[in-house]
């Protein structure tokens, strides 16, 4: 009898254990069949069934019954092929020609420094009945494939948006989100576009002429100077005015602050004669931007010798990573601004002819007269090249050392602008 009870107990325990295992294995699986993997990318995370009513994949015949709201719209991005170059036809013709022909394309008498815009377009197709109305679109454009940093955001009521001032030689990612009535959204897949390598990167800022990125140029050792850190431009407010008369528009301010992310403005205009136009402590961009007056004399036969104290101050600011992104300018963003651009570029290893090319592009700005290579050769380039060194980079480094700029500041600027740590 006892033997029978023990056998019955074992059988009962086995039955209970089997039932328990079945319950555990079956938990949640009645709603989540293990379907073969497929590529439609529209599967419900609850039941693993396809939620796209337009999907015709063989393994997607069975559709989700409602765990996820079906896609209301399909957004298809227009492909941007080739390498995008936003220079105008006139700018490109000039860049393709010799340095000495620049003034035959632009002579500094009118505003020609703005570039073309790129239209990003898409198509929107309703794929369900009674879909909520599209209110507007949000477009995100970034160099980060995860869309977690450096994102430019645009809004549009139409199926396109115009963008400009893109970095050169750069891969961009973009996507579009439709914002629907009621708060729902639909987001497109990600598309990619690539910009051409042709410099300089010219920037469109409403109310400011002659805006360019010092980055993008290749150095003699193949390094590319970082973009998005240091911008040269013309003035933001009217020079020599007794009261501050801001010339950059609200649209221009928004672009500098929201898209370029400007943190500091270095003003090279004279203070003693009020060339700064009444500015004292606050940038025309607002109190969030550090205003750094570095008054340089423009009436001197050698801009380096005549402004050595300010050059030391300027490179102290340039050596501080917290100052970036930074804009710097004089009155029209050409001569004193051109000197600092030449010194920074030369220090980083940008070839001499490339530095001339960048300087001469100021002729496309409204600068009140033309400039040639000889303008800066006689003023400071020959002076720099008299310094010790085999290369222009070495000569620029030693010239600035002799001017009084500490080596640690020069090394810091090179590191910031190229990502190459000196002595590493």
Identify the meaning behind each predicted range.
Residues 20-23:
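C-terminal motif of bacterial Sec signal peptides marking the signal peptidase cleavage site
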Residues 17, 29-64:
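Thrombospondin type-1
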Residues 9-10, 52, 226, 330:
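A general, composition-driven signal for non-globular sequence regions
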